[in-house]
Amino acid sequence: MPKLRPGHFYIALLLGAIAATSFAQGAPTFKVDPSWPLEMPNHWIMGAVTGVFVDAQQHVWVTHLPETLTEEELYEQQTPPMATCCKAAPPVLEFDQQGKLVQGWGQGSMTDFTDWPREPHGIFVDHNDFVWVGSYNRHRVMKFTRDGKHLLTLGEYEKTAGSADTKLLGGPSGIWVDPKTNEVYISDGYRNRRVIVFDGASGKYLRHWGAYGNVPDDTERFDPKTMVSGALPKQFSTPHGITGSNDGKIYVADRRGNRIQVFDHHGRFLAERVIAPATLSSGSAFVPVLSPDAQQQWLYVADGTNHKIWILRRSDLEIVGGFGRGGRQLGQMLRPHGMSIDRQGNLYVGEASTGRRVQKFTVQGSAR
């Protein structure tokens, strides 16, 4: 397959290749770690996982949705208790490297919507140790201290005004903070169709852009079925995850657009890669994660519809492999929806829907 040229697109994967897994020479391989995480205290269990992030201390942060747990799963939590287990864990959780729970907070998200991100979606711990949490269904991104003290809110509770608005958000899904500029990049995509950037200290609006670096248009309608024949949406379909590289590039996972788009920090379009174009439903490109080596050679993409992780070579966005398949057994995945990486190159994958867990995949090959 030829190298990807900036501004050029083509279908990257044949229809029959979705279920196959192959590796280019030197591409990393992974093995599930059955010992991670450890059992949580207090009979706590997770709901659908919506975000995962590994911070500078190599601690793993997780957001999940307690409201997705059923009454049967929460018998101990009923009034009066109906059984000896279980209870919903707080929606924001911090685990150490060994998988032991360090803390959990955010219980107020179920009752107090002023200081907590109800229905959290996406989490990021920045270079100043502040914790950013999104709220996709309530249109806010909120900044906290490590122990959960609320500091700043971007957007307003349950208010949205479209992709042209510079104050309100519309279904924020992913967060990345540039350590050099302290700018907050948000994939604003469950309702809006854009990337939007704010100052991380003041919350001041800075800029935004849509697919291909153009002005976003919320009125465009696109039939995903046409992607099978090579058509691509002119607008973002669902910008769902975002990250930045050491060399100044921004990677956006356009979930229902089945693609990764690459920009510079000002929103100038550089390249894109289509992933599993035959994927309908909710799309193939959920979350982008870069490998921790200095060159950031690999780009990993969580695919919550095909239930796997794709491996791309970052230099040309060539798909060089992948791992995972749908299922509930160890090492299988059901709706991988959040993902992050530690400095050793190990991946942490959080599962939404009824997956409701985080698994650690230890790197075996050359991913550092």
Segments predicted by a language model, with ranges:
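Bacterial N-terminal signal peptides
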Residues: Y10-T21
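Eukaryotic scaffold repeat domains enriched in small/polar residues
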Residues: F23-R368
